[in-house]
Amino acid sequence: MRRWILVGGLLLFAGVVRAQDSLFEVAVACIKRYEGMHDSRHHPYVGYGHKLLPGESFPAMSEKIADSLLRADLRKKCAAFRRFGADSLLLGVLAYNVGESRLLGYGNRPKSRLVRKLEAGDRDIHAEYTAYCHYRGKAVPSIRRRREEEFKILFIK
């Protein structure tokens, strides 16, 4: 009996992991669609928005390398927001584009309203999430559409 309970639990866990993995794949596809492939003209960004770190150099970026860099970066961003549970992927995708420090705060920069609401237990974050659509102080419609799509496909109710 214990064996069957253990097997059932493992199968249930595997189903949850697969669901999260498939959502991760959707997030990767969404980022690829909006970021596009960066080449040397977009220095210091390469591949699908990977920012070169000191000491890194990728003179010739293939699609496969760009994809693996995107996945590694997105996993790091999601790990930074692990404490938010189901919202960690959504916050990781946003941080991939705007940076972790804009959300979590650092130095003189305070925490974002989005993070403060989630910490308070309020998951009604649509307005705060889609507010990250500005470039140089002006709202950009294409960025707003991106945020709307990200929220629609990645927010777990």
Residue ranges and their predicted role:
Residues 42-46, 50:
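Early exported N-terminus immediately downstream of N-terminal targeting peptides
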Residues 8-18:
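Hydrophobic h-region of N-terminal signal peptides that target proteins for export
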Residues 1-3:
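Positively charged n-region of N-terminal signal peptides that target proteins for export
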Residues 27, 42, 87:
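Residues that flank catalytic or metal-binding motifs in active/ligand-binding sites
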Residues 16-38, 50-54, 61-83, 100-157:
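Long, amphipathic alpha-helical surface segments
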Residues 42-43, 57-59:
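Short, glycine/acidic-enriched capping/hinge loops at junctions between secondary-structure elements
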Residues 88-102:
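Short N-proximal segments of mature Sec-exported proteins
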